[in-house]
């Protein structure tokens, strides 16, 4: 049986540390601030934003959610971003994705001041990460790296396979693993013989967005398995991309869904907001 990596517990420990940091800063007259721009009524987005608000309130970060209509024009949204770029009360700006079809996501992310891009999605921040000089790092892969650290999982010389190639998880995850001297393969839905490729991995990170897609046929016994998936099954239950029950029988470490990667993503968002406040003061 695997050791289950408890993301909720680790997130709580880290948030307690961040809270101490915020208390010190507040005594010096600096309160870290985060603004979230939420466009439309997407229920999943609303849940994520509520979780972010809750974490910010617990830690002592000033947080504001700017709810904007689904019909907002690109120009109006760009004007909102510009307003918060100029507002010194807010050290972090986050645009909750996905955006409505009529808005160019890339253009919106480019408009955020890179110093306030606490999600780490701005091309300048991704570029810094890829030349090995990171400033703001996408929060999900960053949180996963903290999990490896907390559980003393050594990455040097290990074979790592990342299933998923998004700019939010897959590509930055591969780069962070590379920076820790892992040998990295990026696979995806079009990879031939995907199960065989995955089975080579000592470290398997799955972010493909398909419920219970990775079964034990994909996993080498003793591998570390990180599940980034957030899917709903037919009963509406939250499930990961990995078939937890069967894979946990052969993996050495595994993250559950829920209470795995999700809480760490939010924690790293809070951490980067506080770090941004320190740099901007």
From Swiss-Prot:
Keyword NADP: yes
Alphabetical list of CDD domains matching this protein: NAD_bind_m-THF_DH_Cyclohyd
BP GO annotations: L-histidine biosynthetic process; methionine biosynthetic process; purine nucleotide biosynthetic process; tetrahydrofolate interconversion
UniProt binding sites for NADP(+): 164-166, 189
One Pfam family this sequence matches: THF_DHG_CYH_C
EC number of the protein: 1.5.1.5, 3.5.4.9
Family membership noted in the UniProt record: Belongs to the tetrahydrofolate dehydrogenase/cyclohydrolase family.
Protein name (database record): Bifunctional protein FolD
Organism: Enterococcus faecalis (strain ATCC 700802 / V583)
